Design a protein with these regions (language model features):
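Sec-dependent N-terminal signal peptides
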Residues: 4-13
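Flexible, low-complexity junctional segments that flank or bridge functional domains
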Residues: 7, 17-266
Length: 266
């Protein structure tokens, strides 16, 4: 099945594409993104083959998918957060047509706040002296879980998550000090990734959720994401003459194109 991809290449004369200064804890949409949102809504309504209306029903789908994309296993949001977001559940369609993007940014900022609370818990409060002889149960599938009401309940859920990960390392004959270091390093890397999110990343995430709500084969690509997609599809960077492969979280040079810049620099 063909995949519908929306490419938006817009030049704004004299207008910065992003906010001048974005606080790490609070990201906000830009005027440019508001304009793009209205444009995407119009393009999807007019040209998508499904001819789906942007209405309350679609709004509920977008809401559920967006919240799930941030916290699919219910590890971060509290029940009060989700209840507070409910006022947007039937209104995202109208917001999209108007280019009003504050709600998805509010949801993301709350997610990042809750995420940081979890990282603080792992770093400063969690004791790694787990009793592996005690019978405990950890539900993995978020569909089988409810959002918890208090941070204390979330702490206990996370204690079991980390205990499960520690047990995996234990079965691999890792020492206790090594286990603690490896787990903290894992979440430090994740925290760095989340901390580096910019306004454009939140916009990309939300707009892609919106496009996929029309059908799973529709996507929104910003200009930067479009270029990255082309690179991934070709698995090469023509500019440097190198072919790349992925090795876990690292990118490796698989081969160098003869005669290219990378080859000449050898």
């Amino acid at each position: 099945m063909n995949k519908i991809v929306i490419y938006i290449l817009i030049i704004f004369w004299g207008i910065s594409g992003f906010a001048q200064s974005e606080d790490l804890q609070r990201l906000s949409p830009t005027q440019d993104q508001s304009m793009e949102a209205r444009l995407v809504a119009g393009l999807l309504t007019q040209y998508h083959y499904e001819k789906i209306s942007i209405d309350d029903e679609l709004s509920r789908i977008v809401f559920d998918e967006y919240v799930s994309s941030l916290d699919v296993n219910k590890h971060y949001f509290l029940k009060e957060d989700i209840e507070g977001f409910q006022k947007y559940r039937d209104r995202l369609d109208d917001h999209m047509k108007l280019g009003y993007l504050l709600p998805p940014y509010e949801i993301f900022n709350t997610f990042r706040k809750r995420f940081q609370e979890r990282m603080d818990f792992i770093e400063n409060e969690l004791e790694f002296n787990f009793d592996f002889d005690q019978d405990e149960y950890l539900t993995i599938n978020g569909d089988s879980l409810d959002y918890v009401s208090t941070p204390a309940e979330l702490n206990d859920r996370w204690r079991k998550i980390i205990k499960s990960q520690a047990l995996d390392f234990k079965l691999d004959d890792k020492a206790d000090t090594t286990i603690q270091r490896l787990i903290k390093e894992r979440y430090n890397r994740l925290a760095q990734t989340i901390g580096e999110y910019e306004s454009r990343d939140v916009f990309q995430l939300y707009m892609n959720t919106f496009a996929e709500s029309f059908d799973p084969h529709s996507s929104y690509f910003s200009p930067i994401t479009s270029e990255n997609f082309k690179i991934r599809m070709s698995q090469s960077l023509e500019g440097i003459g190198a072919t790349l492969t992925s090795d876990g979280s690292y990118t490796k040079v698989a081969s160098v194109v003869p005669g290219g810049p990378a080859f000449e620099s050898k």
